[in-house]
């Protein structure tokens, strides 16, 4: 079975803790991602997702141009070691009710894996391989 490190994205998109929710949403749109790592003084302090924006800001009727990412982010980032299986990541996401996991290598954050990344990995495993003899 594939490992989390094989399914993860290494190109981590980030925003600062004091960025507005509006700015973060535009960054997600422009970069075509569903989450951003949140940094403060070069340290990852959380993650903000599309779901966070919808549930914790938009649905509350908040002014997205005045609300900061820090007020709606999830902190700390839930992580999984990269050598674990994609099934382990799937189970962890289900158990914890999250759609994104930070991927670590001996405790250092090296990537991010989303539900979408797992679906792509599961699909590639389950598709029959066509070979020519």
Predicted regions: what they are:
Residues 82, 104-110, 114-133:
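Cytosolic regulatory modules rich in charged/polar residues
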Residues 60-67, 87, 127:
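Short, charge-rich, low-complexity interaction segments located
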Residues 14-32, 79-97, 104, 122:
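The conserved cystathionine-beta-synthase
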Residues 2, 19, 48, 67, ...:
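Short beta-to-alpha loop/turn elements within the nucleotide-binding domains of ABC transporters
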Residues 2-12, 66-77:
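Bateman (tandem CBS) regulatory domains
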Residues 28-31, 36-52, 93, 101-116:
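A glycine-centered beta-loop-beta connector
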Residues 9, 55, 59, 74, ...:
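Phosphate-coordinating loops and pocket residues in cytosolic domains that bind phosphorylated ligands
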């Amino acid at each position: 079975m594939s490992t989390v490190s094989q399914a993860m994205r290494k190109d981590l998109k980030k925003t600062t803790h004091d960025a507005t929710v509006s700015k973060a949403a535009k960054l997600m749109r422009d970069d075509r991602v569903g989450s951003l790592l949140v940094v403060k003084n070069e340290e990852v302090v959380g993650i903000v997702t599309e779901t966070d924006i919808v549930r914790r800001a938009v649905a509350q009727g908040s002014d997205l141009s005045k609300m900061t990412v820090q007020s709606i982010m999830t902190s700390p980032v839930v992580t999984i070691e990269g050598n674990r299986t994609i099934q382990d990541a799937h189970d962890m996401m289900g158990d914890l009710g999250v759609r994104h996991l930070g991927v670590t290598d001996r405790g250092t954050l090296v990537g991010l894996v989303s539900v979408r990344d797992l679906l792509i990995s599961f699909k590639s495993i389950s598709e029959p391989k066509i070979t020519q003899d």
